[in-house]
Amino acid sequence: MRILISNDDGATAPGLAALYAALEDYAECVVVAPDQDKSGASSSLTLDRPLHPKVLANGFISVNGTPTDCVHLAINSLLDHEPDLVVSGINLGANLGDDVLYSGTVAAALEGRFLGRTAFAFSFASRQLDNLPTAAYFARKLVEAHATLDLPPRTVLNVNIPNLPLDHIRGIQLTRLGHRARAAAPLKVVDPRGKEGYWIAAAGDAEDGGEGTDFHAVMQGYVSITPLQFDRTFSDAFSGLDGWLEGLR
């Protein structure tokens, strides 16, 4: 088995190293990841300059681009054989609810959809490293079990692991995406030369975080697995739009 591993925290991120270490004796793993932190890059592609892959001392390949660039380039140019699986992470910080719209971790997994196979996006609900081995354990466990999955093509499994020791994890739950409240306003700052700028503020708190959501599962000590699809068509809106268009013809 061949696994393509990527992330959005960058090629030197501890979560990426932990994921590789968890999988390297299970499959032939190739790591292609951004050369710097690209959190929040979503599914953006770099179109204004060429991409330059660089092989690092540990064998990982870094690219001066986004997570989507990395997977796109790896599948279409860098690899001699297509991978059997695309795995992204381990992100330091959860990707819950609306986070998936912005997450480079999820985007890297989504780019693997062209293979027509299931892909995984793994996120750990902390930026502290003490319990990162818990996330690595579940990444290995779920990847090992993926061969028995019977899912529609191009399914992405968004996995969030609580910041807990392994023996404190209560189990695994299948969840839906929750929703966040509106984020705080960007923070206005002034640099030493008097030039004004803005920092994007933290994401909003969970607004829809009840039972059954990814928010609730992680808060209750469960690993959350949410199946995602690329098709964002809002089918329920068709009937209302049909009537609206009739009046415009």
From Swiss-Prot:
Name of the featured protein: 5'-nucleotidase SurE
Entry similarity comment: Belongs to the SurE nucleotidase family.
Any Pfam family hit: SurE
Enzyme class: hydrolase
Gene Ontology cellular-component terms listed: cytoplasm
Cross-referenced PANTHER family: 5'-NUCLEOTIDASE SURE, 5'_3'-NUCLEOTIDASE SURE
Cofactor note: Binds 1 divalent metal cation per subunit.
Keyword check for Metal-binding: yes
Alphabetized UniProt keyword annotations: Cytoplasm, Hydrolase, Metal-binding, Nucleotide-binding
EC number: 3.1.3.5
Function (record text): Nucleotidase that shows phosphatase activity on nucleoside 5'-monophosphates.
Compartmental location: Cytoplasm
SUPFAM superfamilies: SurE-like (SSF64167)
Cofactors that this protein relies on: a divalent metal cation
Reaction(s) the record says it catalyses: a ribonucleoside 5'-phosphate + H2O = a ribonucleoside + phosphate
Chief location bin: cytoplasm
GO molecular-function terms, A-Z: 3'-nucleotidase activity; 5'-nucleotidase activity; exopolyphosphatase activity; metal ion binding; nucleotide binding
InterPro entries on file: SurE (IPR030048), SurE-like_Pase/nucleotidase (IPR002828), SurE-like_sf (IPR036523)
Residues that hold a divalent metal cation according to the record: D8, D9, S39, N91
